[in-house]
């Protein structure tokens, strides 16, 4: 909202200095600082409120060291992250930008699903929370909305080349400048480590013959649904020990922030020879607010945690990361900058699959990991959770750097 106020001051009243709000970098810095302050200063008040309302974590007996000490710790702390993210976004972002609208919808949508899940667990004393089928329906619903908007909305365009112009002389010694390519709808995405690193989902339907491109949504929307569901569930599984989900998510989002900034800037995208996505740079403001909120939340969530984010936070985090990756056409790189989420999810899938297979084959279930998700495996091996979290953060940073390197490494 302040963006529009200062825009009025600048363009209508011609007030000196107010034009600084036109710069994404300036607004991103303000969004980060405000979200950090909100999550640290007001976070304590939210925690005290949750404690007074007896919104405490119910700990399942898993045989893990120190787990009983966590009983009664306030949960639903994801409300802090949501609040500290949205307030700066409403103040400093261009709210008519389609990408900002999508991210706000994603935050509120996934936050609501997570909140209902936590509410049922705490106040209805149902340890299972919201039934899995309803979570999936919510995730699929968001996927359909995001996929449809990105595919059909005319404001979402992509320029798949560098935007360079060719200047040459004709035989008549006339200078000719080729016009810049037209920005158009596209379902292209980025493939890492490949020279001509773009793949169009529409190509999957090339067997349909001429005009197959108009049916690309049949592939694109299911892909969006899968990514949102997978990443949000991966974030949910990662939220098992103090500071793990918030810290690794902050690293992932920082990597996405770099992708978003360069993809939305025609100069940087031209230099790096990457896909230019008009208007996507505005997401940098949202990302800055989101990172500030996550870091501020870590102030209280690091070991020993004073608050847990609950599904209110973890599902929201996963949904936001997924939508950011899809919007900036870096969803394939999720396996790198969200490598921790992938490892946690894979450990659960492998554990359950192997247990069922061995039970059917040998009459008794066997396990590959001492416990899944993966962080519990290391807890069972005797590692202190703070050491596990620190090492997972280090791995997350390495994977994020590797994903950023793909901008030039082909």
Curated annotation (Swiss-Prot):
Superkingdom: Bacteria
Catalytic activity: UDP-N-acetyl-alpha-D-muramoyl-L-alanyl-gamma-D-glutamyl-meso-2,6-diaminopimeloyl-D-alanyl-D-alanine + di-trans,octa-cis-undecaprenyl phosphate = di-trans,octa-cis-undecaprenyl diphospho-N-acetyl-alpha-D-muramoyl-L-alanyl-D-glutamyl-meso-2,6-diaminopimeloyl-D-alanyl-D-alanine + UMP
Entry's localization field: Cell inner membrane
Pathway: Cell wall biogenesis; peptidoglycan biosynthesis
Protein name stated in the entry: Phospho-N-acetylmuramoyl-pentapeptide-transferase
Main location, first listed in the record: membrane
GO biological process, one term: cell division
Record EC number: 2.7.8.13
Enzyme's top EC category: transferase
Biological role stated in the UniProt entry: Catalyzes the initial step of the lipid cycle reactions in the biosynthesis of the cell wall peptidoglycan: transfers peptidoglycan precursor phospho-MurNAc-pentapeptide from UDP-MurNAc-pentapeptide onto the lipid carrier undecaprenyl phosphate, yielding undecaprenyl-pyrophosphoryl-MurNAc-pentapeptide, known as lipid I.
Single Gene Ontology MF annotation: metal ion binding
NCBIfam families registered for this protein in UniProt: mraY
Pfam families, sorted: Glycos_transf_4, MraY_sig1
Keyword match rRNA-binding: no
Similarity field: Belongs to the glycosyltransferase 4 family. MraY subfamily.
Taxonomic source organism: Flavobacterium johnsoniae (strain ATCC 17061 / DSM 2064 / JCM 8514 / BCRC 14874 / CCUG 350202 / NBRC 14942 / NCIMB 11054 / UW101)
Membrane topology: Multi-pass membrane protein
InterPro entries: Glycosyl_transferase_4 (IPR000715), PNAcMuramoyl-5peptid_Trfase (IPR003524), PNAcMuramoyl-5peptid_Trfase_CS (IPR018480)
GO cellular component terms given for this protein: plasma membrane
Keywords assigned by UniProt, alphabetized: Cell cycle, Cell division, Cell inner membrane, Cell membrane, Cell shape, Cell wall biogenesis/degradation, Magnesium, Membrane, Metal-binding, Peptidoglycan synthesis, Transferase, Transmembrane, Transmembrane helix
Entry's transmembrane regions: 23-43, 73-93, 96-116, 132-152, 215-235, 248-268, 285-305, 307-327, 332-352, 387-407
Cofactor(s), names only, from the UniProt record: Mg(2+)
